[in-house]
Amino acid sequence: MLAAPAASAAVRPLDTGVSYVYDDEVAVAFQHVKAAGAGLVHTPIRWGDVAPGERPAAWQPDDPAEPRYDWESTDRWVREAVAAGLTPVLQIRGAPRWAQRCAHAFSNDSPCDLNPADLSAFATAAARRYSGAFGGLPRVQYWQGLNEPNLSLFFLPQFDSSGRAVSAELYRTLLNTFYGAIKGVDPTNVVIAAGLGPIAVPKFTIGPMRFTRELLCMKGKVRFRPAKGNCGGGVNFDIFAIHPYTTGGPTHEGGANDVQLGSLWKLKALLRAADEAGRINSQFEQTPLWITEFSWDSQPPDPGGLPMKIETRWAAEAMHTAWRVGIDAFFWFTLRDQPPEGAPSHISIESGLYFRGPTVAQDQPKEVLFAFRFPFVAHPHRKGLDVWGRTPNGKGGRVMIQILRDGKWRKAKALRADSVGIFRGRIHTGYGRNRRGAARAVYKGQDSVPFAMRSVGDFPHPPFGRPVG
């Protein structure tokens, strides 16, 4: 899948994936992932569910055959993902209460002062089980260590008793430990740092820019440089990850320490500076950046979600923005709308690529799925019409750009998608300057969603929908 970071490659790919795919009908779900054009699929191993509720007096926690572990659902998930031709990405998420060192550990999903030795043992067991050499199970190469450690919702403590931020320092120790465990099983495994939440919330959440600076022992707001010391020899991971949920459109930047779509460039610049300073120990010369979660709730079904036409347009623009700044992989959260279970619509997750049906097989695709599968944008300006897109299968070939004139689609220009399916170019035309009309791309008989010449400007909108009623 990922052979080298985009910045050093002759071509710049944008691999696509779907995150948090899990369901009883997982084989059907994976066919829907494939239908969305994605090659990567992501799910958590919930450590607190796999491990026993109490720490056994005598056991082998690093042994993949330890009988007190319950791997049944993960085994099936991995088998079905690989059988479907997908590349699995497993995230170790949460922790059992006995692996947490806080006096009061309230949740398996938001570990509090997690014991690095316990994390190492479980990560070793998981990586050995899915090494390709255990019990006939397929290999998993991509491993992510925890979830959103800059958010108090998923990682504690964020601050010590004096109010000093400590989560980045704590996570550095855990990440280095996780890296050692995963690489100790197979040095060609790929370790992904936990995806960071996008927005700073005083007293609860540390903004991802600040968190990353502290994690990597860097300083500066725009011109990044190393802080004093050697950062304990550096931070060990292969790929960095962000969840740039955006409280607006694809150009929205947020605050100084936030990372939303419009400010992805800041995080790329920080990682580049950290690479140059030798702060990151990675198998790549330039650290790749993945978006492992991103989406907006759609309307319908969320009455406070983005209208479907806008979400569809913004999804294509989001993928273009990601590719332009050098993102290597873009995951949509998630495959199907999650059941509200009595929660308000702005809290429930209705950002799926599919409307949820009675069964996975009965799910229906949303319009946004087709923009995710075959993203295409066309922006008019005084020098012509600039276009960009990615073919549905991420492969090369001839792409015909068409424009809508007098109610009919007419050929405008033929382009060539490169070996990873990216095509772009400029059509020297005045078409679209009056903000009328639309363009689309056609690849091997498949049409992209038409992209209207009338732009949709940025406006405030919560990613999971506005409160309604």
Q: Which functions belong to the PLM regions below?
A:
Residues 9-46:
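Boundary/entry segment of secreted carbohydrate-active catalytic domains
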Residues 14-20, 39-43, 88-92, 143-145, ...:
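Hydrophobic faces of well-ordered beta-strands that scaffold small-molecule active sites
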Residues 421-425:
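Short strand-edge motifs at loop-to-beta-strand transitions and within beta-strands
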Residues 53-68, 99-114, 136-137, 152, ...:
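Surface-exposed intrinsically disordered loops and tails
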Residues 58-60, 144, 149, 154, ...:
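Aromatic-rich peripheral "rim/lid" segments of glycoside hydrolase catalytic domains that contact
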Residues 1-9:
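Secretory targeting and sorting signals
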Residues 36-206, 247:
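Substrate-binding cleft and catalytic face of glycoside hydrolase catalytic domains
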Residues 27, 31, 120, 124-134, ...:
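Noncatalytic carbohydrate-binding groove/subsite architecture in carbohydrate-active enzymes
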